[in-house]
């Protein structure tokens, strides 16, 4: 199967590192012009340099803006008024006992992980429907369906994002625009390395820490390892393609078999 995204513009929120940057790399490799986003201009410069090293000749736009705010979305819109592919990847996570999560933290998690995606969909979906083509993907998590006791606030936001996905898919029905979620499992990023250290201790070598984390905290995984960000990028490339035109309103999994279900 040959996937060619030449002529498409793809916006990936929260793409200065980790999963977001890996998604941008794979979309660029497939021919899309990619829009990198983050709050730090210096981090975005580094991300752009890394992407161009991995994908020479890639077409890249960099927009420093906090997309967890309405003002940040306005800044983005002024630079990138139309996109063909929207990947809502922006998100925060962290471990905290349930009773220690105060109102401000609950609110912050919702604003960053859910409301940012809603704003971007509201911003870009109308032009997609007018053009008769568009792809929207929301990066969710196994925590949406297997709520971890150490971060129920994060799990709540990812469950909400599944509902947002299905609802906007219905709103876009028959327009040529598809809207999907991608449920990702434990993924090897710098942020997850820090998270693993919080749970199993920072005195272990990485290979041992990863193995301990998977055994003690994610034993349901069928692959027994962290997922590589590129593996998520591969799914996003498919969902962004013409070949995925009949796939919408769903929650596709790149979770290493972590979620114990035969559906989807």
Q: How should these model regions be labeled?
A:
Residues 9, 16-17:
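Conserved glycine-rich cofactor-binding loop
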Residues 97-98, 105-110, 136, 217:
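Substrate-binding pocket helix/loop in short-chain dehydrogenase/reductase
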Residues 121, 157, 165:
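Active-site helix of classical SDR
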Residues 126, 170-171:
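Alpha-helical segment proximal to the catalytic Tyr-Lys
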Residues 141:
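Residue(s) in the substrate-gating loop at a strand-loop-helix junction
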Residues 146, 236-237, 248-264:
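Short C-terminal tail/terminal secondary-structure segment
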Residues 173, 178, 247-249:
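Short, small/polar-rich loop/turn modules that mediate ligand/substrate recognition or access, typified
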């Amino acid at each position: 199967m040959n996937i060619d995204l030449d002529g498409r513009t793809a916006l990936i929120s929260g793409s200065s590192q980790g999963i977001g940057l890996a998604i941008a790399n794979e979309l660029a490799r497939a021919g899309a012009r990619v829009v990198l986003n983050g709050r730090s201009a210096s981090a975005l410069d580094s991300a752009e340099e890394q992407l161009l090293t991995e994908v020479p000749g890639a077409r890249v736009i960099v927009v420093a803006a906090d997309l967890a705010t309405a003002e940040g979305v306005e800044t983005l819109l002024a630079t990138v008024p139309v996109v063909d592919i929207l990947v809502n990847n922006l998100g925060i996570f962290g471990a905290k006992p349930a009773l220690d999560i105060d109102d401000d933290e609950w609110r912050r998690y919702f604003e960053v992980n859910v409301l940012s995606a809603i704003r971007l969909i509201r911003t870009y979906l109308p032009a997609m429907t007018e053009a008769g083509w568009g792809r929207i993907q929301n990066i969710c998590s196994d925590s949406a369906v297997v709520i971890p006791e150490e971060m129920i606030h994060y799990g709540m936001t990812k469950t909400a994002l599944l509902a947002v996905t299905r609802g906007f898919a219905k709103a876009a029905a028959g327009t040529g625009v598809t809207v999907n979620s991608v449920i990702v499992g434990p993924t090897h990023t710098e942020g997850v390395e820090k998270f693993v250290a919080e749970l199993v201790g920072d005195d272990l070598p990485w290979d041992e820490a990863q193995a301990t984390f998977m055994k003690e905290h994610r034993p349901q995984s069928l692959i027994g390892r962290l997922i590589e960000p590129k593996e998520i990028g591969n799914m996003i490339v498919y969902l962004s393609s013409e070949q995925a035109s009949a796939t919408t309103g769903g929650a596709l999994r790149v979770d290493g078999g972590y979620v114990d279900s035969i559906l989807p």
